[in-house]
Amino acid sequence: MSERNQRKVYTGRVVSDKMDKTITVLVETYKTHSLYGKRVKYSKKYKAHDEQNQAKLGDIVKIMETRPLSATKRFRLVEIVEEAVVI
């Protein structure tokens, strides 16, 4: 059970929910440049498993690393932190 706590947990924004039971999450983070020391923003997209299709486009979600669920899915949806405002 203690190994579950070592899994990666990321917070990001849903950029695609068009697939069945799958969302694409954009995670933005910062890296420090090795020579100049400036913080540089970079982003990465992860596909995550959404069993109930509850996450919608623009939501802020938390995803956790899990066993491989498909060729590209390695994460699952933990919770929806903030729902998107629909205008």
Curated annotation (Swiss-Prot):
Domain of life: Bacteria
Gene Ontology biological-process annotations: translation
CDD domains registered for this protein in UniProt: Ribosomal_uS17
PROSITE patterns per the UniProt record, alphabetical: RIBOSOMAL_S17 (PS00056)
GO MF annotation terms: rRNA binding; structural constituent of ribosome
InterPro entries for the chain: NA-bd_OB-fold, Ribosomal_uS17, Ribosomal_uS17_bact/chlr, Ribosomal_uS17_CS
Sorted UniProt keywords: Ribonucleoprotein, Ribosomal protein, RNA-binding, rRNA-binding
This protein's record includes keyword ATP-binding: no
A GO cellular component entry from the record: cytosolic small ribosomal subunit
rRNA-binding among keywords: yes
Family, as annotated: Belongs to the universal ribosomal protein uS17 family.
Main function: One of the primary rRNA binding proteins, it binds specifically to the 5'-end of 16S ribosomal RNA.
PANTHER family with a match to the protein in the record: 40S RIBOSOMAL PROTEIN S11 FAMILY MEMBER, SMALL RIBOSOMAL SUBUNIT PROTEIN US17M
Subunit structure: Part of the 30S ribosomal subunit.
Protein name stated in the entry: Small ribosomal subunit protein uS17
Organism: Bacillus mycoides (strain KBAB4) (Bacillus weihenstephanensis)
